[in-house]
Amino acid sequence: MSKRPVKQERKEPETTGHSWDGIEEYNNPLPRWWLWVFYATIIWSVGYTIAYPAWPLVSSATQGILGQRAAGDTRLDVARDIALFEEANTEIRSQLVETPLTEIAADPALVDYAQNAGAAVFRTWCAQCHGAGAAGVQAAGYPNLLDDAWLWGGTIEDIHLTIAHGIRNEEDPDARWSQMPAFGRDQLLTDDEIAQVVQYVRLISDQEHDETLAAAGEEVYLMQCAACHMDDGTGDPFQGAPNLTDAIWLYGGDVETLTETVYNSRFGVMPSWQERLSEAEIRAVSVYVHGLGGGVESAETMQ
């Protein structure tokens, strides 16, 4: 097979001389100027990577012989901005830490700073569970922080303690702790007794219920549940025992969900934040959560 270009008839394009099953290739090389431009871009790109920051390394990048910082170097920019922010807010952050929790509300400037800083902390660390709007996720047992139904108390001191130490967090000895028995799994109650007490809970929470089962469930409730949830079902924030008489449920108030709760118990865990957040950040987010709408006034504030 010939390797030499073949001249075709007049006005027909030249081919390379190659043929594959009768198919020939036109001999149409790129223009010289295009090739020289292509070569020039290669040379320019190599020169650019030598002159300016370009090649990534393990913990940084080549800086370039011209010593210029890449535009928009986010690591340096962020570090600088954080340093400037910390410097600008040093005084008010110190004031936030030094002011007693119950007296923060009396300082409008301090409240304004705490609300804004707390909102940023909440979006970064808390919204993953409690939702961006703080309404919680009932299916997963993440509490709604917008209402006034608090498991462990809703004063600013209560909220601060909960955030700082967490709930049922084994890593922090000062974490809030409570344990609901698994009445069915541990065979503390029979299936019939569980069905009865579930109907009684629906009775005291003003939901549709079976009157016969609810009447029998009252005795079961007083024997097994009232020690934590109180005789009237209003709960005990000191133990983290929820109020069973309102329409606010951590996991749900339907028969199926209540049966699951009584049978297998619940064991929600909240991490301790005192090792991850500064005291100023914990106080700021405490003020923010307290001000979402359900915060309870502390006894000291009311005096």
What are these regions (language model features)?
Residues S2-A109, G153-D158, T162, P181-V201, ...:
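Periplasmic c-type cytochrome electron-transfer domains
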Residues E25, W34, Y48, V121, ...:
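Short, flexible micro-motifs
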Residues S94-E103, N116-A117, A135-A139:
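A short mid-domain helix/strand-loop element embedded in enzyme catalytic domains
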Residues L110-G136, D147, G153-T155, H160-L161, ...:
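Sequence/structural segment immediately N-terminal to covalent heme-attachment motifs in c-type
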Residues A140, L146-V201, D232, D236-G294:
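Extracytoplasmic electron-transfer domains, predominantly the class I c-type cytochrome c fold
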Residues V296-E300:
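Core catalytic loop region at the nicotinamide-binding pocket of NAD(P)H-dependent oxidoreductases
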